[in-house]
């Protein structure tokens, strides 16, 4: 159950950080969106790894 709560916390943090950045920079700097999307992919990959580790610990 804790891993589910942690997952939602990670998603909420990502949304809180990424969405304003996209809204703020999309009009002035289109190339910034590519960088933001790349960092979002990296963040989601890290979050996925963390969740897999937590589930593996829970299974033991």
Curated annotation (Swiss-Prot):
<keyword id="KW-0929">Antimicrobial</keyword>
<keyword id="KW-0732">Signal</keyword>
<dbReference type="GO" id="GO:0005576">
    <property type="term" value="C:extracellular region"/>
</dbReference>
<protein>
    <recommendedName>
        <fullName>U20-myrmicitoxin-Mri1a</fullName>
    </recommendedName>
</protein>
<feature type="propeptide">
    <location>
        <begin position="25"/>
        <end position="34"/>
    </location>
</feature>
<keyword id="KW-0800">Toxin</keyword>
<dbReference type="GO" id="GO:0090729">
    <property type="term" value="F:toxin activity"/>
</dbReference>
<dbReference type="GO" id="GO:0044616">
    <property type="term" value="P:venom-mediated paralysis in another organism"/>
</dbReference>
<comment type="function">
    <text>Induces paralysis 5 minutes after injection into blowflies (L.caesar), and then death within 24 hours. May have antimicrobial properties, like most ant linear peptides.</text>
</comment>
<comment type="similarity">
    <text>Belongs to the formicidae venom precursor-01 superfamily.</text>
</comment>
<keyword id="KW-0964">Secreted</keyword>
<feature type="signal peptide">
    <location>
        <begin position="1"/>
        <end position="24"/>
    </location>
</feature>
């Amino acid at each position: 159950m804790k891993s589910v709560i942690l997952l939602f916390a990670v998603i909420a943090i990502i949304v809180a950080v990424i969405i304003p950045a996209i809204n703020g920079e999309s009009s002035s700097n289109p190339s910034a969106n590519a960088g933001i999307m790349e960092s979002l992919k990296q963040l989601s990959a890290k979050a996925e790894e963390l969740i897999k580790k937590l589930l593996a610990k829970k299974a033991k």
